[in-house]
């Protein structure tokens, strides 16, 4: 994904305000052993790009003065109540160094999963993205999660995912194989089953 940017020589609160008033957004690109570079981008183009999932999880080609640098979107600041991007941070990437990036999960075959189609269960997404480690060339835009064989009451874990070549998932918090999604019994059916069980227990209870 290509991003056209322009070098900027001034910085500070006043300069940034004037830049935004002219329809531009201040930004910085840093990392990969090179000096940080102050840049500016067209605000409207940036605002719409931020709505795209791929903009957050892809290697971006940032063109400045005819030269292209590969980078990741690392941070951005939005105005509290205006549709305004205040600042953006990009991090350069090296083709030979692994990067850590959060990648979205795309869930497939939810409607045809046995637990939904036959058991009338409810799909619960426990994770919506995962942090991966890989070389920039191997970075996927998303990872597919196939729920096509999941039965009611079953859970899909990180270890069950099919990962692209060269990609590993980083886990945190001590759980090496966290849950990704499951199919649960609807709350109404749980209550009905509990009532039926209680009624059956009452019928089986001997008279006093």
Curated annotation (Swiss-Prot):
- In Gene Ontology terms, what is one molecular function of this protein? 5S rRNA binding
Instruction: Identify the stretch(es) annotated as Disordered.
Output: 186-208
Q: Which Pfam families match?
A: Ribosomal_L25p, Ribosomal_TL5_C
Tell me where on the tree of life, at the top rank, the source sits.
Bacteria
Q: What GO terms describe the biological role, i.e. biological process, of this protein? A: translation
Keyword Protein transport assigned? no
**Cellular component per GO?**
cytosolic large ribosomal subunit
Keywords assigned: Ribonucleoprotein, Ribosomal protein, RNA-binding, rRNA-binding
Looking up Gene3D superfamilies in the UniProt record yields: Ribosomal protein L25, beta domain (2.170.120.20), Ribosomal Protein L25, Chain P (2.40.240.10)
Task: Output the InterPro entries linked to this UniProt entry.
Answer: Rbsml_bL25/Gln-tRNA_synth_N (IPR020056), Ribosomal_bL25/Gln-tRNA_synth (IPR011035), Ribosomal_bL25_b-dom (IPR020057), Ribosomal_bL25_C (IPR037121), Ribosomal_bL25_long (IPR001021), Ribosomal_bL25_short (IPR020055), Ribosomal_L25_dom (IPR029751), Ribosomal_uL5_bac-type (IPR020930)
KW Ribosomal protein (keyword) present: yes
Biased composition range(s): Low complexity: 186-201
Question: Subunit info?
Answer: Part of the 50S ribosomal subunit; part of the 5S rRNA/L5/L18/L25 subcomplex. Contacts the 5S rRNA. Binds to the 5S rRNA independently of L5 and L18.
User: What is stated as this protein's family in its record?
Assistant: Belongs to the bacterial ribosomal protein bL25 family. CTC subfamily.
Q: What does this protein do?
A: This is one of the proteins that binds to the 5S RNA in the ribosome where it forms part of the central protuberance.
Q: What is the protein's given name?
A: Large ribosomal subunit protein bL25
Top-down, what is the taxonomic lineage of the species of origin?
Bacteria, Pseudomonadati, Pseudomonadota, Betaproteobacteria, Burkholderiales
State the encoding gene: rplY
């Amino acid at each position: 994904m290509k991003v056209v940017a322009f070098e900027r020589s001034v910085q500070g609160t006043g300069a940034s305000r004037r830049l935004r008033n002219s329809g531009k957004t201040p930004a910085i690109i840093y990392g990969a052993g090179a000096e940080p570079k102050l840049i500016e981008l067209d605000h409207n183009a940036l605002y719409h790009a931020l709505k795209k999932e791929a903009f957050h999880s892809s290697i971006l080609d940032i063109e400045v003065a005819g030269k292209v640098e590969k980078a990741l979107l690392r941070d951005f600041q939005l105005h509290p109540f205006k549709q305004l991007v205040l600042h953006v941070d990009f991090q350069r990437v090296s083709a030979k160094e692994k990067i850590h990036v959060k990648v979205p999960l795309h869930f497939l075959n939810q409607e045809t999963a046995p637990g939904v189609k036959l058991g009338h269960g409810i799909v619960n997404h426990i994770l919506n993205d995962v942090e991966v480690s890989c070389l920039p060339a191997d970075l996927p835009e998303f990872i597919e999660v196939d729920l096509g064989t999941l039965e009611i009451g079953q859970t899909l874990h990180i270890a069950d995912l099919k990962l692209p070549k060269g990609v590993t998932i980083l886990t945190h918090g001590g759980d090496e194989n966290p849950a990704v999604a499951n199919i649960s019994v609807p709350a109404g059916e749980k209550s009905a089953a509990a009532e039926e069980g209680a009624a059956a227990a009452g019928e089986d209870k001997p008279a006093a």
